[in-house]
Amino acid sequence: MYICKRKTKNDMKRILSLAFAIVLLATLPMQGQGKRYQVAGVAFYNLENLFDTIPNNPLGRDAEYTPNGARKWTGKRYWNKIHNLAYAISNMKTDLTPMGPAIIGVSEVENITVMQDLARDEQLKAWNLQVIHHDSPDRRGIDVGFLFNPRLFRPLNVTHHTLVVESNPNFRTRDQSCVSGLLLGEPVSVIVNHWPSRLGGQKQSSYLREAAAALSKHIADSVLAINPKQKIIIMGDLNDDPMDPSCAEVLGAKRNVKDVEEGGWYNPWWDVLASGVGTLAYRGQWNLFDQIIINYNLVGKDRSTLKYFKCKVHNDIPGIRTEEGDRTGYPLRTFASGVYLNGYSDHFPTQIFLTRELK
């Protein structure tokens, strides 16, 4: 929701001054080359069951996240969760992006209210994050969402897309949200996802994630049909790794930039996982489900427009890891085995950095 008011002459002067300061903040010297670049961070974070305390799911699927429910989800626990997540997000700023990520896609949020509460936390208040949210048909009552810094990204169009699986017509999952706008003034589209889980087995449920990947590709193709030069990002908790069929075959996201052809996709997380780094772990096995995949228009050596620079798993935020026991090094969750841990999420956040040379 946007609230607009008439701008005075002094307001416009302040806005222009702020815009100039933002350009300075978003630039850095490339060591040894004498060049300066603007940098934009684009991030994703699975917030793991960010429910409020009010029972409002028609099917009662949020009952455990109420004060009298199984999780004893009191106001105190809710606000602890908000504060912890805001702390993690505030630590996603880097030397390259002192204002934090321009865009943060999220998953497992119950409604727009929890996103607004997160954006208003004191640790994020200075960023003035704005919220885009859509209630989807997922039976658990969780959705994807979109946070953005309005000084760095301006949304122009938002669409939401429901996954329909012909062989399983009663299946319901999270809708995919496509947000198109201007990132540092350049047209960019971001498709935020939370693909179906591996419930029932990885292989047995793979067809659902492959269908979700096909929907993401269809959305992207529709955008490219209007503007073949559009920069597109597919992000989310994909519940698959980079080498799984949904990503590697249906999307066709490549491990090596040199293999990405026009109209194709690059997946920088393939090598990250191969190095032993993931975003979530189960029984000693790391996975990298939280991926940010980019299209052909975001790769290449031409730095006159925004291009991919590097990626990062934010597993080094102080306090975000489990420090003891058989889950040492894992993301510190809110609950584990039914025990309240006052943690963050069962996933680490991820981020890519896009750069553009300043002339």
Residue ranges and their predicted role:
Residues 68-78, 100-106, 133-134, 165-167, ...:
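Second-shell loop/turn segments in exported
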